[in-house]
Design a protein with these regions (language model features):
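Alpha-helix boundary/capping residues
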Residues: 68, 245-248, 328, 379, ...
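Short acidic (Asp/Glu) and glycine-rich catalytic loops that position anionic groups and cofactors
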Residues: 37-41, 224-225, 300-304, 352-356
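Ferredoxin-type iron-sulfur electron-transfer modules in oxidoreductases and energy-metabolism complexes
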Residues: 265-294, 302-304, 310-405
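Peripheral terminal and linker regions in Fe-S/redox and tRNA-modifying enzymes
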Residues: 17, 32-33, 74-80, 87, ...
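Active-site-adjacent bridging/hinge elements
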Residues: 202-203, 297, 333
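Membrane-embedded alpha-helical bundles of multi-pass integral membrane proteins
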Residues: 1-280, 323
Length: 426
């Protein structure tokens, strides 16, 4: 009867040795993840998400599992393949561990008979999806590397290392499967349609005599690379695989184009406590949700591509702004005055038109505008504005328009603007 023999082709001590090897990697992973995310992500899903847990799960399904924003562009399809393939293969590995370490000692096997055969075919199919997605992503990253600016080189190299590591796992997974069929042929090998074909190719190449040695070497290197990627997750761009889904699920209830407010005047009137901070100078002044969202950023640049201020040639880059704040967060500099240290430049803050195009473009629902507005408010509250900006704000306060025109001339101005717009169209 078909049954999964997980450690059948390695020495008896390898099973214990594998878990001993995994232990230090697991410690590095858990400590790093706790330092990066703590329990803030889960807490925000419960306390901040719009519509409760059901709505949070719905957002995760639409924008996490189905990658609706990511897949809107052709370059997003490889990511969808990588994501789905990784998710299925991770689930498959988990099922294998449960079958061998939990149910087998209890006298029950999960991966046996027809269940095991369907499992093998399903895993092979999504393994192909995983590898194809990684190959497409690798080609795209290598092509893009030529035009990448210095500020993005480091993150691009991280992505390349991550892609190569995952690709190694995908390819060696198939090779290990093929070697298993060479060493121990079975009648049901056809259900593993990739492994059985690769086994035929390797046999034709004369791998048979060294199949056992090759299998053991690949088995250990496969495990080592997998454990290394797990341990690196909290410290590299791979962190977005955890932070992004949590940020998707923990979205606030207000519309994407609605600006944040530092306080509710009605609540202040009711409580009588008027000691409020209008703006922000450091990350510690921002809402915990905004600080958490920084860790979900993948530096993809979609916000830059749709930013009208950047298209007009201003210095503003929503991507660079978020990445600069993210770097301070990961360095633990949450109390640093980012305005005084010029981490966030005044010109960048005033270049933003608050159109929220970046908010709509972000695949993980980061809101760059929500970082800009508090810092801009601080500049106004601290009178760190030039004469033109002072006049602009005074005109808005005095006459409700930026030009300082009397209220009775507003209709005339609107008519002139419509006329000018009409003549330009002609």
């Amino acid at each position: 009867m078909p049954v999964r023999d997980t450690f059948g082709l390695v020495p008896p001590w390898a099973e214990v040795g594998l878990y001993v090897l995994f232990a230090p990697f697991a410690v590095v992973f858990v400590v790093g993840l706790w330092r990066r995310l703590s329990w803030a992500g889960l807490r925000r899903i419960v306390t901040h998400s719009s519509g409760g847990i059901a709505a949070a799960i719905g957002r995760f399904g639409r924008f996490g599992l189905l990658q609706r924003r990511v897949a809107q562009r052709p370059r997003g399809w490889p990511h969808l393949g990588i994501f789905l393939g990784f998710l299925v293969l991770l689930a498959a590995t988990t099922i294998v561990a449960i079958d061998w370490d939990i149910t087998r000692p209890l006298g029950f096997r999960v991966l046996i008979g027809q269940r095991y055969l369907f499992f093998e075919s399903f895993a092979d199919a999504f393994g192909v999806v995983f590898v194809v997605g990684l190959l497409a992503a690798l080609i795209w990253r290598l092509v893009r590397l030529r035009s990448t600016g210095p500020d993005q080189r480091r993150i691009q190299y991280q992505f390349l290392v991550l892609i190569c590591g995952l690709l190694y796992l995908g390819l060696t997974g198939f090779v290990l499967e093929a070697l298993r069929f060479i060493i121990h042929p079975v009648t049901w090998a056809g259900w593993s349609f990739v492994g059985v074909r690769l086994a035929s190719l390797l046999s034709s190449a004369g791998v048979g005599p060294i199949a056992q040695t090759t299998y053991e070497a690949l088995w250990w290197t496969h495990a080592f690379v997998a454990f290394s990627l797990i341990a690196s997750l909290p410290y590299t761009t791979f962190l977005h695989s955890v932070a992004a889904p949590l940020n998707l699920m923990a979205q606030p209830g207000r519309p994407q184009k609605e600006l944040s407010t530092p306080f509710d005047l009605r609540q202040l009137m009711e409580t009588g406590e008027f000691d409020v901070k209008v703006g922000a100078t450091s990350l510690s002044d921002l809402d915990s949700g905004l600080r958490f969202a920084l860790q979900a950023c993948t530096n993809c640049g979609r916000c830059d591509e749709v930013c009208p201020a950047m298209a007009m040639g201003t210095a503003l880059s929503p991507r660079r702004l978020v990445q600069a704040l993210r770097a301070r967060l990961l360095a633990g500099l949450t109390s640093e005055d980012v305005l005084a240290r010029n981490v966030v430049k005044h010109a960048d803050l005033w270049a933003c038109t608050t159109c929220a195009a970046c908010v709509e473009a972000c695949p993980v629902f980061i809101r760059p505008v929500d970082y800009i507005i508090p810092f801009r408010r601080q500049l106004v509250a601290g009178q760190q504005i030039d004469k033109r900006q002072t006049e602009f704000l005074a005109n808005l306060s005095r006459s409700s328009n930026a030009y300082g025109l009397p209220a009775e001339q507003r209709n005339q101005l609107a008519a002139e603007l419509r006329s000018a717009a009409g003549s330009s169209d002609e």
